């Protein structure tokens, strides 16, 4: 005998709501020397609450999964500085402006049933980024590499809990894509209807996932630096681990 029926794939959540943000900005602007010299300073703090997350563990009496819930908070704060000078020499006008901004990002709350949220996975790599309370948003997690074993050519991972075993408990924050600060400069010049603008910008302190030195691409080459700097013989003081196509997770490095 057969029966037909239906059931919801997940429990409903009538309390689900929009994420909200609260922000404060404090600033000072100064202009001197007939507006030729100007200076700006700002402090900002933004708190985003009730981030919508998935993967909440349901009660044992519930037989299906839970719907997305408001279960995460993030805080961003930092300073912004700007200094500029503008002047003219007869028909020639020019200006120079520089700026620098800092950013501190931190997950301040995550639902108590979640230790961390994993990002999407990549083929041959696995999970690369995590969302976890007390860390920058989507930080990089892995083993901290302290060097290359001169006898075996294998990377040496730091034993974070000093138990003599390298395992999941030794994984830690090894990087973040969020920069410590960003900066920029702009130069302008104008003369009798002609003008020129030159600008540049950059960032400092952000980490980049170095997936280009993975050895799982069996039909692709690697960069010359990794080939020349790899361990080859016992006693080598190498910068990179030995080549080993059967074990390609060592490119997930923190050094």
Model-derived segments and spans:
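Surface-exposed, extracytoplasmic segments of Gram-negative outer-membrane nutrient-acquisition systems
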Residues: 2-9, 44-71, 104-178, 186, ...
